[in-house]
Curated annotation (Swiss-Prot):
It comes from the Archaea. Keywords: Initiation factor, Protein biosynthesis. SMART domains: eIF6. GO terms for molecular function: ribosome binding; translation initiation factor activity. The lineage of its organism: Archaea, Methanobacteriati, Methanobacteriota, Stenosarchaea group, Methanomicrobia. One of its GO terms (biological process) is cytosolic ribosome assembly. This is Translation initiation factor 6. Gene3D superfamilies: L-arginine/glycine Amidinotransferase, Chain A. Belongs to the eIF-6 family. Binds to the 50S ribosomal subunit and prevents its association with the 30S ribosomal subunit to form the 70S initiation complex.
Length: 220
């Protein structure tokens, strides 16, 4: 259910993969020990593809059980792989790093505060969730300043009461402050989780792990 891991020595595991309840999207050639840990700890099928030819899957993909929101620069070959598992929404225009700018689960999608309203509404309709434009800890790239599963939402330790209230008005889940990798507030860069388990970056401290377990309901 739990553990810490790196990816070829890099603890920023959330940059290179995106996890859902049933699948984990990881770039081809990712270390076997990394993909095996995701499959084992999170009980997911591994889906292997690049996005726009890049390995930074976590930065370029968001979504939930309803669908995937993907950079509009993804290739037809990459989209063919993804479409075997979900419907796919292409995020076009200059603000297209979906994983960086969308924090989503099956209850809500929080998006970059400067995202065009019509685009945000399209994403909400596609994912079948309400949408809120906000910052977390003053950071606009909410997909990396927070991490959401269907059991809780972990947010940047400097997130203020107003930012948290904006989420609480929409979603009835535990929302807590936390960090990863020895103090990084960009929790999405160092965490992969679903309702069944989690893995955190290899330098995440015991205190940080305890906070992750509390917010996501893994304390026994």
């Amino acid at each position: 259910m739990t553990g810490t891991i790196d990816l070829a020595g890099d603890p920023n595991i959330g940059v290179y993969a995106r996890v859902f309840e049933d699948i984990a999207i990881v770039y081809p050639g990712a270390p076997a020990e990394f993909t095996a840990a995701l499959a084992r700890e999170l009980d997911v099928e591994i889906v292997s593809t690049f996005i726009q030819g890049s390995s930074i899957i976590g930065s370029l993909v968001s979504g939930n059980s309803q669908g995937l929101v993907v950079s509009g620069l993804a290739t037809d070959e990459e989209l063919a792989v993804l479409s075997e598992y979900r419907d796919v929404f292409l995020l076009k225009g200059p603000m297209n790093a979906a994983g960086n700018i969308i924090l989503a689960n099956d209850c809500v999608a929080a998006v970059h505060p400067e995202m065009q309203i019509d685009v945000a509404e399209e994403i909400g309709s596609f994912l079948e969730v309400p949408v809120v434009r906000l910052t977390l800890g003053g950071i606009k790239t909410v997909g990396m300043a927070g991490f959401a599963t269907n059991k809780g939402i972990l947010v940047h330790p400097r997130a203020n009461d107003t930012e948290i209230a904006n989420l609480e008005r929409i979603v009835d889940l535990p929302i807590g402050l936390g960090s990863v990798n020895m103090g990084s507030g960009l929790v999405g860069t160092g965490l992969l989780a679903n309702s069944k388990g989690y893995v955190a970056g290899s330098v995440t401290t015991g205190f940080e792990l305890g906070r992750i377990e509390e917010v996501f309901g893994f304390l026994e």
